[in-house]
Amino acid sequence: MLRIKNKAAAQATFDEDYNVPDVKPDIGRLVQSKADVSMEEVRLSEGRALLKGTLNADLLYVGEKEGRIYSLSAKLPLDEMINLEGIEGGDKLCLKWEIEDLSVHMIHSRKLNIKAIVTFYAVVDELAVVELPVSAEDQEVSVKTEKVRLMSLRVHKKDTLRIKDDITLASNRPNVENLLWYMAEPRNLDLRPGENKLRVKGELAVFLLYTGYE
């Protein structure tokens, strides 16, 4: 059976000052911010997991002079270690994370302060043999039997589903000059097993904000 060998949680904190790139206009007012984590390397050694990646922070703002909307992206390096007693280099790690308390404050028109907390949840599973009693020879011991349906692990893996599609703008929409902001959210997911495969069906809701040609 598959059981948890070890699990742990760790937090990475960010408190960084970020200079606005020279090609971007001065910031007049912050509108919205978001962030995600990109993992570049997850390496297991004896008793610990080493994580390397980046925190990608996106910002939408109004320019100080023109009053137009602009966007910029900041990449903050991430280097974290999670202690997991008993794990080895060949073990498989299931890693999840959650971004908490993301805040972006303007120091002045050319500098921002970015704060965030990222909580990592790590779980290492292992296959184990479990012995179960099937009978008792002592006549003074009462025995109650019951049929139990057992399931065995057939596949333990992960995969990436890549979606590529073209969207034609409505005729009353201007042509795209610059893409400022986007958000994508999967909806109505339906997973069904097939022969040697897993069928995934659903919708991807996409929101776009862009500047058009004048």
Label the predicted regions.
Residues M1-E214:
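Viral structural modules
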